[in-house]
C-alpha cells in the first residue's frame, strides 16, 4: 500500500498476516536467548533502528570490582549495518549463518583487516552537504582500494561533523567495499 495516510498501518497489518508465525517464533527467541533483541515491524529501516534503539556507544560494567567502559559492537544481517560506525560503534553486516551463530552466543571469526585512515580537512561550505562528502570519499576510497579493509575517519573535518552526518559516511562503506567506515569516539558520540 502507498499514497494514503494509512499506508503504514495497512502494510504493517499485511506483514503480520503474512508472517505471524515467524513473528511468534522471533518473540519466543527474544525471551529465550539473552543476545536476541527483536524490533517489531514498522519500527523503521534496519540500519536506522540500529542507531536509534539498539546500539550503545559505551556500556559500563563492573569487572573484578572495577568499573570498566566497554565499547559497543554490532553485527547485522544487512550491508548497511555500517551506519552505526558514525556513532562510534564497531559494526558491519554479516551473512545469515554468521548472524544466527552470534545470536546464539558463539564467536565469529575473521581475518584482521588492514586499517586505512581517511583524513577529512576543512568545513562544509554553504552549498555542500554531508552526502557530498560521502560521495567524494567513496570515489577516493574506491580509487585507493579499500575492499575488506576497515576505514577510520579522522582529522579536523571530522571534528566539524555531527554524529548524524558521520552516520552518512559509515552508511556508504559497502559502496567503497570496506568492511566498515568508522568514526572514533569523541564528545559528539
Regions found by a protein language model. Give the residues of each.
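Fe-S-dependent hydro-lyases/dehydratases of central metabolism
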Residues: 1-189
